[in-house]
Amino acid sequence: MEVSFSAPPPPDAASAAAAAPSLVPAVSAAAVAATTVSCSPQPPTGSPSADDRILVSVEVLLHATSTARAEDVCAAVERMLEARSLSYVDGPVPIPNDDPFLLANVKRIQICDTDEWTENHKVLLFWQVRPVVHVFQLSEDGPGEEPGEDDTLSSFNEWALPAKEFDGLWESLLYEVGLKQRLLRYAASALLFTEKGVDPCLVSWNRIVLLHGPPGTGKTSLCKALAQKLSIRFKSRYSMCQLIEVNAHSLFSKWFSESGKLVAKLFQKIQEMVEEESNLVFVLIDEVESLAAARQAAISGSEPSDSIRVVNALLTQMDKLKSWPNVIILTTSNITTAIDIAFVDRADIKAYVGPPTLQARYEILRSCLQELLRVGILTHTQGGNSLCLLSYFSLMENQHCPEVADPHGSVHLSGLLHKAAEICEGLSGRTLRKLPFLAHASVANPSCCDASAFLHALIQTAQRELSESRG
């Protein structure tokens, strides 16, 4: 099985051509020349064999109107990659103008999974890599609701994956290094163990993920993005992928003992979906503590006794789903201590999602400013060149260079952004993405906002937001 793991964005082929290519020239002059000429790559003596090469995912998004076979597109992309002696870096790959087949059918080509190497300042050269191409189209159907009984709240929302609503969500989420890769690898291992027929009596795994942490850290978004990413990676194995977002509040009845029955009915519908072997189903239970409230609290009298039946029904139904190989349960919680210990014990991965680190805060704010520059809300040109804010690692490497003295240079402006990120310690990712809007609203002349003035306003806004959050 060829499974690889992920990273970054781009909206379409046009922006991909304008963006920095994710396949960048190798360090040598010969490799630089190779970027403009198709050639047969010649790996150096002693290069790794095919089995030892690093798997790197290449995600290929087709146009909504494309009717090309995935196999044909995959072969065309592989030929395109083989014809170029390049190093691999996360990001968009420009579609060659001399390939009418790809131009007509492909909206975007994206290199993924190299972030762990770039974090360690390593370069992946073409002869070290084995690309794994994933071809997909986005569903534009939107969410569907499963109506509850007697005009009550719908019991769940359903998405066909990969969905247009979640496109780019994975790349926009920034956490400590390794968290997203860990979740991807877990899911790949869980499906592999099932596919190979590993005896669950000897090796136990439940295909249950629990993300916990304070509100606003992106736990629910990460679950949706993970389901989207896995639906792309396993598209060749499962012809259909679905995300079922459970509305936990709809499962509580005003009638005594009815709540447990509602949980059983919901999971019966989910079981009908997973009975189709070609269907991969992700079940998302947000704020699972509302369902899995501790039975001990109910026994002590601080929780209604009906909650015992709800917890028992939830655990029983989850155990039933374990026998089906094509379902993964994703759960989130803001209050881990309120969850029944029997539920926590069933989760294979219990990952804490805390407030973003300094690096994550910087990259979140940088992505916001890049978007404002892209649409023209912020303006900045120095010497005819548009502003290019440095990545976190590039800034760390260049913070003592002479260009820091230039108040309009990229290094100086990136330093101001870094100062804002330092001030924002303790703020959630949700709050961080609001700051650029609040900063723009505080600028004296918002219709013509210079990047330098905006960054100073952003620092003031961050200080004000932090003081307000601390009371």
Curated annotation (Swiss-Prot):
Keyword Nucleotide-binding on entry: yes
Top-level taxon: Eukaryota
UniProt: ATP binding residues: 213-220
Family: Belongs to the AAA ATPase family. PCH2 subfamily.
Keyword ATP-binding among UniProt keywords: yes
Name under which the protein is recorded: Pachytene checkpoint protein 2 homolog
Protein's job: Plays a key role in chromosome recombination during meiosis.
GO BP terms in the entry: meiotic recombination checkpoint signaling; reciprocal meiotic recombination
Signal peptide range in chain numbering: none
Gene Ontology CC terms: chromosome; nucleus
Keyword entries, A-Z: ATP-binding, Meiosis, Nucleotide-binding
Protein species of origin: Oryza sativa subsp. indica (Rice)
GO molecular function, one term: ATP binding
Pfam families: AAA, AAA_lid_TRIP13_C, TRIP13_N
Transmembrane regions: none
